[in-house]
Amino acid sequence: MITRAAKLLLLAGIALNYTLVVFNNVTDFDSNYQFVHHVLLMDSTFPGNHGMGRAIPSPGLQLAFYFSIITWEIATTILLWWGVVRLLRALKLPASAFNAAKRVPIMARTLSMLMWLVAFLDVGAEWFLMWQSRTWNGQEAAFRMFAVVGLVLLILLQPDVEGAP
């Protein structure tokens, strides 16, 4: 029961984090948009780099990219909280039911990991050379979230068996 509760609480912690991320992106829209704007504009990368042709100067496309991130985060948040409810309902049920209840949280955490990996580490850091920026480099935060969510996903993936602590 303790192991199941730990899995549930860790999932709830990530769901809370995502709720706050969405809240911040919506209520402090411009500050967070500026991050996306500058990464896509590539205006703080190394002078003279040969990747500047990748930059997206269109504010409309930058806004669309930012909205897609927020939409991804909202979808992930909904799945995370849905997963919390599913695990909570299955907390005292047989191990097979608890294991089955993990499907939604596994999808949610995978969606989360894909966002941090694809949107920030692959597209932002590598394609738009975010790693070159002293001001708009979100690699450390993205990797931190990727690692935390991944660790919790690995914990959740451990099968539950009858009689486990």
PLM ranges: what are they?
Residues 3-35:
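N-terminal signal-anchor transmembrane alpha helix
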Residues 24-37, 83-96, 125-132:
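Juxtamembrane transmembrane-helix termini
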Residues 24-40, 73, 105-112:
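Alpha-helical transmembrane segments of integral membrane proteins, especially early/N-terminal helices
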Residues 30-61:
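Membrane-interface interhelical connector segments
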Residues 55-76:
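Individual transmembrane alpha-helix segments
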Residues 78-110:
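Cytoplasmic juxtamembrane regions at transmembrane-helix boundaries
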Residues 110-165:
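Alpha-helical transmembrane segments of multi-pass integral membrane proteins
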